[in-house]
Amino acid sequence: MISRVTEALSKVKGSMGSHERHALPGVIGDDLLRFGKLPLCLFICIILTAVTVVTTAHHTRLLTAQREQLVLERDALDIEWRNLILEENALGDHSRVERIATEKLQMQHVDPSQENIVVQK
């Protein structure tokens, strides 16, 4: 650490005597590459981790919304299925079938004495 400070001071003293102009971005880049490799790598890792966290949170929110939509759809289908079961039971009721047969189709009960049995060989 002390050697860096003395090196920097010697550069400043040397540059004060001469009227050279240094490009600030070049000096900063040179310092980063020479002395700041670890902090630069850590900074890049932090940025990548932050982007990954944001992306993961976004995907989690999308999947949660999709799950909620699927739960609502499942509930609607369950209600429809129950209504269809009730309708099937109501339409298949024997008294209803018998009433429709006698009223709309004019069907009658056959007396056992009037029954004809057909035997197929």
From Swiss-Prot:
Family classification: Belongs to the FtsL family.
Lineage start: Bacteria, Pseudomonadati, Pseudomonadota, Gammaproteobacteria, Enterobacterales
InterPro entries assigned to the protein according to its UniProt record, in alphabetical order: Cell_div_FtsL
Membrane-spanning segments: 35-57
Origin species: Escherichia coli (strain K12)
Function: Essential cell division protein. May link together the upstream cell division proteins, which are predominantly cytoplasmic, with the downstream cell division proteins, which are predominantly periplasmic. Can also mediate Zn(2+)-sensitivity probably by increasing the permeability of the inner membrane.
Main subcellular location of this protein, as a coarse class: membrane
Alphabetic keyword roster: Cell cycle, Cell division, Cell inner membrane, Cell membrane, Coiled coil, Membrane, Transmembrane, Transmembrane helix
One Gene Ontology term, aspect cellular component: FtsQBL complex
Coiled coil feature spans: 63-91
GO biological process entries: cell division; division septum assembly; FtsZ-dependent cytokinesis
Keyword set includes Cell inner membrane: yes
Chain ranges on the Periplasmic side, renumbered to this chain: 58-121
The keyword Transmembrane is annotated on this UniProt entry: yes
Motif (Leucine zipper-like): 58-85
Subunit note: Part of a complex composed of FtsB, FtsL and FtsQ. The complex can be formed before its localization to the division site. This tripartite complex can be divided further into a subcomplex of FtsB and FtsL, which forms in the absence of FtsQ. Also interacts with FtsI, FtsN and YmgF. Homodimer in vitro. May form multimers.
HAMAP family: FtsL
Effects seen without this gene: Mutants show inhibition of cell division, formation of long, nonseptate filaments, ultimate cessation of growth and lysis.
Domain of life, per lineage: Bacteria
UniProt xrefs under PANTHER family: CELL DIVISION PROTEIN FTSL
Protein name in the entry: Cell division protein FtsL
Membrane topology (Cytoplasmic): 1-34
